[in-house]
Amino acid sequence: MNESYPIGRPFGIEVRVHILFLWMAFFLIFVGGNPLGTAAILFTLFGLVLLHELGHSLVARHHGIQVLDIVLWPLGGMARMSEIPESPRVEGQVAIAGPLVNLVLAAASLLLLGLLGGWGEAMGPSVAYILAHILESPTNFLRAFIAMNLMLGVFNLVPAFPMDGGRVLRALLATSMPYVRATRIAAGVGQVLAFGFAAWGLMGGGIFLLIIAISPVLFPLG
């Protein structure tokens, strides 16, 4: 893919990083007031998105689908495959594998946090506070790790096609109706949700909701 560069081949799958991610990382790290904390957040998130995409890729490969590469973008990642799964069951398994990776990591990290005595204030005052203090202690890092995994897992399960949740919805619908009709319904649900998120964001819900609304179009994850 143009403007992306190979950085490794985990499990024999080429991973590429888009130049926009590199520019974004450089800008956020060196322009912000907390370069070490920002770098920790960015590269932890980078690793979690990669694991998310590897979840999709390894399940796809298990079902005989060739994975061409994984490209990491500023707001997500994309596992490029040689074909779309023909079976709704296989498509559902491939789609849900990515979010499940993040949710399992969040659950395991929450257990570890409990062993370290951090359950009493597991999430702290807010996600923003957790991320701002990511390097202050091992428990703070774990809280940030949990928060990022939950955001990735839950965000991707929103049934807004072509995101993972939308693909799972299409796979479920396709078990009882033609594939084309299932796609139209899943896409329609995604458009309604995108409109709702955009309206909420414009009315004061925050920029994050606007990003949710447009990201399935601009930066599809998985």
Where are these regions (language model features)?
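Hydrophobic transmembrane alpha-helices and their immediate loop junctions
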Residues: M1-G222
